[in-house]
């Protein structure tokens, strides 16, 4: 609110997993908040996240112990998911959350975006749709290369991740069943 006091924004877009543990505060201080939750396979996104964190740490450290990065951030991600799921269980209004799979967003982004707007009682103008289509065409996945990483780089495996994400993975399976194509692309 401080950042926008002179020029109020129509809409804020906050895109980081760190917001997952602070959903009640977002609702309290921003009132008409709406959460768009893009769901990813945790065994795919957590190693990507660990790689990103490791590269960021290299900027400020002579040595980065990737096993330590993994131990901290896998637990932290599990904690954030748990906090978000607990909040969601108490505040499950359809107007508060829209669930979209990351794969659907990548494979059919226009349909996913149209669903996000529809859940808000809005629609995409033909002009905005054209902007999205142009952006998709000009920026295909992998345009700037591929980010490569493996769980083994961090001294962990899928079973280690699942210790901290079981509840979320079950939630995701239920969503896939309930929402069909929005989560299965």
Identify the role of each PLM range.
Residues 15, 26-51:
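Conserved phosphate-donor/acceptor-positioning beta-strand/loop module used by diverse small-molecule
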Residues 1-25:
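Alpha/beta-hydrolase fold catalytic core
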Residues 19-24, 43-46, 106-109:
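Flexible loop/turn segments at secondary-structure boundaries
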Residues 3-12, 49-185:
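PAPS-dependent sulfotransferases, especially Golgi type II membrane carbohydrate sulfotransferases
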Residues 16-19, 31, 38, 77, ...:
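Active-site-proximal structural scaffolding
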């Amino acid at each position: 609110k401080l950042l926008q006091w002179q020029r109020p924004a129509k809409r804020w877009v906050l895109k980081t997993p760190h917001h997952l543990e602070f959903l009640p505060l977002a609702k309290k201080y921003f009132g008409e908040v709406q959460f768009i939750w893009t769901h990813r396979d945790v065994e795919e996104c957590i190693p990507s996240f660990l790689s990103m964190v490791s590269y960021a740490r290299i900027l400020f450290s002579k040595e980065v112990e990737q096993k330590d990065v993994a131990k901290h951030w896998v637990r932290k991600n599990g904690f954030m998911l748990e906090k978000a799921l607990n909040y969601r269980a108490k505040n499950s209004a359809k107007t508060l959350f829209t669930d979209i799979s990351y794969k659907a967003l990548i494979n059919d982004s226009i349909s996913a975006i149209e669903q996000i707007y529809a859940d808000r009682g809005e629609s995409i103008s033909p002009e905005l749709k054209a902007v999205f289509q142009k952006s998709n065409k000009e920026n295909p996945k992998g345009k700037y290369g591929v980010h490569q990483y493996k769980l083994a780089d961090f001294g962990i495996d899928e079973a280690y991740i699942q210790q901290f994400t079981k509840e979320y993975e079950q939630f995701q399976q239920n969503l896939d069943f309930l929402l069909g194509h929005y989560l299965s692309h």
